[in-house]
Amino acid sequence: MGEVVKLSNNLEKIRDVNPRLVSYNVEMTEVTGGTFWKAYTDAQIDGTEQVPPPDFSKGGNPLAAMHQWYDPIDTTNPRLRKLAKELGSCWVRVSGTWATRTYYDFADEYPAGSAPEGYQNVLKKEQWINLLDFVKAVDGKLKISVANCDGLHTHDEPWNPSQAKLIFDLSREYGVPVEAVEFVNEPNMLANTGFPKDYTAADFRRDQDIFHKWVRDNYPECAIVGPSDTDPMAMQVDPDGKPYNENADAGASAGIAEALPYCTTADLLDGCTEKLDVFSYHYYNGVSERMAAMMPSAFTPAEGAMSEEYLGMAGHCARCFSLYRDKYCPGGEMWVTESGDAGAGGHTWASTYLEVPRTLNEIGDFATVTNGVIFHNTLASSDYGWLKHGTFVPRPSYFAVLLWKKLMGDTVLASGEAIRPGAHVYAHSRKDGKEGVAYLVINTSWTEATTVELPKAAEVYALTGNGKMRSRTMLLNGKELVLGENDEIPALEGVTMEGTVEVAPGGCTFFVL
């Protein structure tokens, strides 16, 4: 017997949320060209072939064994720009671990494939101009992080703005200013994020204060965001060091940070004199198959992709980190500046319909906890990208978030339904501004339909897999969602229904009352 959900047209308001709640990342390594996560094979995506464990026999950086080379993304591509613009105004974050070691070669000093000593990648002026044009074309707002590596300074020397000034000034002069900035990406992983040799948490606090003061003095319109970390300890203890419970699981969303040396949020922020405008953290549902052999406790197999434990991680993280936000940035928004189904490039099913319930549940759950922005990692790179790398063909998760942005307004409402197996229910105002409610009902059961009782006629938008949960395309009310002949977006139209409606096993259905 499946769950029964009763919808209502009279719900209590929880809060208003940032209109750019749904935003995304463009990795700096995409812009410059460089290494990123190795692509899965078709058989691995289908779940018929296992992902081999990484080969560490060559030594060096343990993560490098899981990477491959990718040429720079073409941010001038008409399809890419069209699909990004369809999402409406979003924050566009250009960052990632690679950004910490990227040299801004705006004077064209270095030939392709080379970088100054102490840096890994080189960003050319033309590449950055193309990125700025992209942000402008899609009505985006630009957020970045900056370089902080051996090429810029040693650990016992303070950070200096010689590189950061180049990218801030060029962006502002071009008419696409940096409107928000994090100092660096994931500073909690001190030894594996590109920092100067022997860099410590104390060095970071010193440099972050220097950077934040420099930004405020020279670019006062730019919001200061941080610390942009992935802190497993935050899942165990509150900011005062008190355990949440005896069985708290540090690996619940720690991702890669759990396997590498790291410091805590408190290590990064205690004693800092420059305050944050926005508190940020990173969240993944553990790690993908690429790192499952190294971190089995942080890996969830496909059969657990709709479990309460797996889907509950986003809200759990938000509730835990909101306590740190309240301590270090009281009254500020909370931004998840990197988010996805799994660290290390996404699960094998990230590009299929099976990722859609998690994607939509994350947005809905987060908005019930706090106000802020979720930056999906990524727009168009690796298996967790909303668009397929290179071709920019939209994946099921792209159309899912497009529907969210089309239907769900910025006022969060109390759904009146407890989150439970088979029924994850979220409610917002209508995006069109009309009186009424927009609901999302996610059926997390693999076998039972969920029955929804409507108080009146509603427009129904039912999302399902195309014949299977790991399908490459998705159906809306039984019609396949694919681009038209000239990249036209398919009609995202609802069906008027009344009485009772069934949400199929694994289905995600929007109801607009």
Regions found by a protein language model. Name each.
Residues 275-282, 290:
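Aromatic-lined glycan-binding groove of carbohydrate-active enzymes
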Residues 352:
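Ligand-binding pocket segment of bilobal, Venus flytrap-like solute-binding proteins
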Residues 120-123, 284-344:
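Glycoside hydrolase catalytic-domain groove-lining segments
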Residues 186, 282-284:
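Histidine-centered active-site/metal-ligand motif
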Residues 1-183, 187-253, 260-262, 270-275, ...:
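Non-catalytic accessory regions flanking glycosidase/transglycosidase catalytic cores in CAZymes
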Residues 265:
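Glycine-rich S-adenosyl-L-methionine
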